[in-house]
Each structure stands twice: as C-alpha cells, then as structure tokens.
Design a protein with these regions (language model features):
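PLP-dependent amino-acid enzyme catalytic core
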Residues: 3, 17, 25, 46-383
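Intrinsic disorder/low-complexity segments enriched in small, polar and charged residues
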Residues: 34, 40-43, 54-57
Length: 383
C-alpha cells in the first residue's frame, strides 16, 4: 500500500518497524492474497483425490471485507517478523441476523481479532511510533499510561517487542482479566481508587513522568497520534471493505480517538455520511452529569482532547441494560463475543439503522471481546 494510494496523512505510520531511528519501508508484505472458487475447491477437496469434497461453487461468494485481495499467484500465509506487524487488517462482519427487516444493513469491524485483543493496539502503535520519531521515547525508556486496560495491553505488547518498560495505572473498577494480561506482558500495574476515576489514574501517571526523565506519558486522551492512526489505517480499511458505500458510522467514545479519526476520514471520502458517537450513562460528552456505569471502555467524566466535535453529527447515550442486553444477543444470535462497549455500539447502530431504512449502510466497531469481562459477569448484566 503505497502511502499516496491510501491518504496523504498515513506516511509516518506505515513501514516495516525497525529499531528506533531507523528508516522505514512499505508495510504491504503481509496483505494476504485471494482464493477463488476453483482454488478453494481444490484445497478443500485435496486436489480431487481420494476423500475429496463436493463443493457448490455458486455458494462461494466474496467475503464482506477486503482482507483477501486479487492475485494470480498461489495464495500462501505470510510470516511476520514480530507481533506488531499483525495489528490491523481486521475482518468486517455484516450482522444479518440481529438487524430487523426494513432497517439499513449493519457492518461490524471485529477489532478484538488484533493480537492484543482490542482496537487499542492501533492507538498504542500510533502513539509509540510518533513518540520515537519526535525523540520523546528513546531506547530503554519507560512508557507510562492511565488505562482501563486495553490501551495498557497494547502498550505492553509493543513494549515487550521494543525493549521498553511499561508502567500502567488502572482504576480498581476495571476487569481483573485485563490487569492479568498486562502483567503477563511484563507491565508494572498499579490499581488506583475508583473514587478518583480515570482522572486520578492520569494524575498518578503524570506525577511519575515528572520525576523520571526517561519516562514518556502515552496520554491517549490528549495525544493526537491516537485519532491520526485511526484516520491512517482503521478508516481506510473500513472504507475499502465497504467499497466506499457507507451512510453512517457509529463508534463508542472513551478517548474518542477511534471515533474522531474514522469520522474525519469518512467525512472527507464519503459525502453525506453521518457520524454518531456513543456514550454510556454517567458520561458528560453530551452535556450530562458524570456518574457510575458498568460498561467499560467508553463514557468519560471529562472531554478528551482527542474528541473532534466538528465531525460529530449526533451523540447517542446507551444505558447499561441495553449495552449488556445487546452483548447477550450478539453471542446468541450472531455468534459474536463482544465486550460491553461493543454491545453499546451495536445497540446504537441498530437505532441508526432503523432510522435510515433499507438500502442504507451503517458501520461500527466491536472493540474487544466478552472473554475479557467474564469475571465482571458480562452475560449476567455486569457488576
């Protein structure tokens, strides 16, 4: 993917990732090639030999995404040099069973299939790459962040590959599974009091950085590398997967990096697209009062600097019951194990789809998996 074929802002993020300070080259070597119906028949049928399978070629239609690209070469699986090269190019699923008749089509990008298990792998890469390029993060340095968990996992995943120490501050209310994963990846995790919220965790992180010249605060709530990376990668993937045909995009807002980056790209490339931000009860994005909520990953007690209000057409508030109810429906009806923020995003997407009506298209993201919240009783309404 030559940078000028994707978008002019993508350059800093693409390229094989060498040591800090090394020049980078194209990162297109890991895009898989396609398998046509005849090839698939031969592969599955063992080239027609003993035990071959009979396959109806007419039922082998293209996947509803652009993960597979056309090629005359024999398809083969690629080998990555490190785990970070496997972030992105996630598939998109059309939610055919959950969407009611007469509503717009709804497509969900399954970001829990990133190696770190969430969409936050992308923000982590974008933030670290820019910090290296600007000289803010040097070899042997320490990455510090306040996180609900997923960004911390992404930072730890990259830190272990890049030789950085990672120190994270996580409010106690967030799931233990995520904390265990961060620690397994070598991160030092400090739990902060629930009463202090994310603002308290951020304050603790900034205090640590102030006393350590080798430490870098990732700052996902204010670092514009967060939305910029989504603009350069996630948005482009979604646009290509949908062949540029999208009428509304609906995303949960925590840092709002995913929303802001993708909405900005779509506004530039899909005229008339409607961008909808999703927040949970107790969030102040739409001017409400801060308060408690069970949904993890979205809902803020302050307005992040990474929220671009200029590309936001609407904010939909989804309460805990509707978010967790949709999580159960996604699992039981679509076979999708979504986290609670994904449940909220899909619930809001269904509202938008009903309004738009048949023939229109709504795109959303499922940021992470329900497996990350089993201790929080995600299928029983959460705790």
């Amino acid at each position: 993917m030559a940078n000028d074929q994707r978008n002019p802002r993508a350059g800093e993020f693409f390229g094989a990732w060498g040591s800090p300070g090394e020049s980078v080259s194209a990162l297109d070597m890991f895009r898989p090639t396609s398998v046509n119906a005849a090839q698939m028949t031969n592969v599955m049928a063992g080239q027609g030999g003993a035990g071959s399978l009979t396959i109806d070629d007419s039922r082998l239609r293209p996947l509803p995404c652009n993960v597979l690209t056309k090629s005359s070469e024999t398809p083969r699986l690629r080998v990555a040099d490190d785990i970070t090269q496997l972030v992105g190019e996630t598939p998109m699923l059309q939610l055919k069973r959950l969407v009611p008749a007469g509503a717009a089509d709804v497509f969900a990008k399954l970001e829990y299939l990133n190696p770190g298990g969430s969409v936050k792998d992308r923000a982590a890469i974008g933030i670290i790459r820019r910090a290296e390029q600007e000289g803010k993060l040097k070899p042997g340095g320490t990455i510090v962040e306040a996180t609900a968990g997923n960004t911390g996992i992404g930072l730890a995943l990259i830190g272990v590959n890049r030789g950085y120490k990672v120190k994270l501050f996580v409010p106690e209310l967030f799931s233990e599974e995520k904390v265990k994963i961060m620690r397994a990846l070598g991160a030092e995790v400090t739990r902060t009091p629930d009463a202090e919220g994310m603002a308290g965790a951020i304050r603790r992180g900034k205090e640590l950085v102030a006393g350590d010249p080798n430490a870098f605060m990732a700052g996902q709530f204010e670092n514009l590398a967060n939305p910029d990376y989504h603009y350069a990668t996630t948005a482009v993937e979604m646009f290509e997967q949908l062949d540029g045909k999208v009428d509304a995009v609906v995303f949960g807002c925590g840092t709002c990096g995913t929303f802001s980056g993708i909405a900005r790209y779509m506004k530039e490339h899909a005229p008339g697209v409607r961008a909808v931000a999703v927040e949970t009860q107790g969030s102040i994005l739409a001017g409400g009062e801060p308060g408690p909520h069970k949904v993890e990953g979205i809902g803020v007690s302050f307005i992040p600097k990474t929220f671009d209000a200029s590309v936001c057409d609407e904010i939909i508030m989804v309460n805990d019951d509707d978010a967790f109810g949709t999580v159960k429906k996604l699992a039981a009806i679509e076979g999708v194990l979504a986290g609670s923020s994904g449940g909220a995003a899909v619930f809001a997407s269904l509202q938008v789809a009903r309004r738009l009506g048949a023939g229109k298209r709504v795109a959303t993201i499922i940021p992470d998996s329900a497996e990350r919240y089993l201790s929080k009783k995600i299928f029983e309404g959460g705790i």
